[in-house]
Amino acid sequence: MPYKVRVNARLTAALFLAAILLASLCSCSLKANERERRTRQAARAIQGESLALEEKKSAALDKYIQSLAERERLAQLFVINLEGDEKFSFVERVDDGGQKDRPLVPGGYIFFSFNISNEPEKIAAFTDSVRDFARSNDLTEPFLCLDAEGGYVNRLRGVAGPLPENEWVAKNLSAKEAFLLYSLNAIQLRALGFDLNLSPVVEVQNEGNAAFLDGRSFGSAQNVLVYGSAALLAYQTNNVAAVLKHFPGNNSVDPHKALPVLNFSAAGFERDVAEPFEALAKDAPAGVLMSHALVSVDGLGQELSQGQASLQGQKTPASLSPYWIRSVLRGRLGFKGLVFSDDIFMAALEKNGWPSERAVKGAILAGVNCILMSEKRFAGEWKLVKKLYEGDADFRAAVDDSVRRVMKFKLDFGLLEYDYLSQKIVPAQERPPLSERLEHFYGAKKLNQEALEKYGQR
């Protein structure tokens, strides 16, 4: 066969094979495009269904809130202490909408050391009795919370497994080990009946606050980000809400005794406050707890309260400041969860011109959703809220916003449920039997003890 003919034959064959390959590739590409189109279509359908479901849940939550008596709605803003350590007994009744002598139960209860028995069985029975009372009186369950930071600030010290202070954790454990530690603690908290932990402390430690924090901080800004995130995710993965504290910070003055006054340089504020809280806000913490401190930042001047006739023009503690709550925490840093005050009976407020009733009004207008009180009675503060709610449109709007945020939290963390058949918000199903929960508690405690035994932590 002549050379040119052979070359042409090879060229023809090559072109033929190339055509077949191109056709095959086009076919594969078309099939891939079709698969991708169908995948995107399915994803859009799922996303649409998810959005539709969220809209239904949101509408159902609004209806649920509207169905509540005013007494119960307004009470959602308060988190108070309670009597005893064995069986729940409410202490206050009020008249509401023609109904006489109705039990007044807050949105949440905080447990202190004297509320904690040294026997896990009694603690779990006590928390059960709180929920039983709410159910038997057709009330929304209050959330149950405590401080379990670690070290000396741990209401379950000696009952649950070892929980070292934050400083020790950052020095001795990796982030993965810290996540395991806090996960085991969360399982124990949940088994005993607690819904929310007022922890972790995510203040960056410096010379100005080291004496007050005393081991409660993870240390540097980097450590706060790494270990604060580990703690936050560990608790909330195990269905215990976490509350970051204290924003925007403290100094060496103990707010239980006096009013802290802080001044940040612009760079210091960005490094030690804004950046850590903004980053951690992306992990969707259930709450942030405000500090009772007068705070200013160089270049911004003294931050004054705004929109509060009774406090106009006065320097205001961060816990009562619309600037720090609405403008900075929510606006700039993007936080979407619950805002907690610190205890309004601390000397930082009470001895510096903000007695409880004035503090309650200021906190609500500033954007606080949960007013923390170490007292066991709150009828006086509740009556003030009721009076202002009925006569002040701005106050009413702030209360309505807070009530909805609290109820959304309760829905998200299982104190309320969305019934798909009736499309209504209903009380959560009863928790597992006490025996089963205690089995979880002791199992997690054993693992907790074994994990820290090599460090001499018991």
What are these regions (language model features)?
Residues 4-15:
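Bacterial N-terminal signal peptides that target proteins for export
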Residues 94-112, 184-196:
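Catalytic domains of carbohydrate-active enzymes, especially glycoside hydrolases
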Residues 15-24:
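Bacterial N-terminal signal peptides
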Residues 131-161, 181-204, 224-249:
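Glycine-rich, aromatic-flanked loop segments that form ligand/cofactor-binding clefts
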Residues 4, 28-100, 321-324, 331-332, ...:
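Preference for extracellular/luminal or secreted protein segments
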Residues 119-131, 135, 223-236, 240-398:
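Second-shell residues forming the walls of enzyme active-site clefts
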Residues 83-87, 115-118, 148-153, 196, ...:
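Solvent-exposed loop/turn segments at secondary-structure junctions
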Residues 75-82, 107-111, 142-148, 196-200, ...:
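Hydrophobic faces of well-ordered beta-strands that scaffold small-molecule active sites
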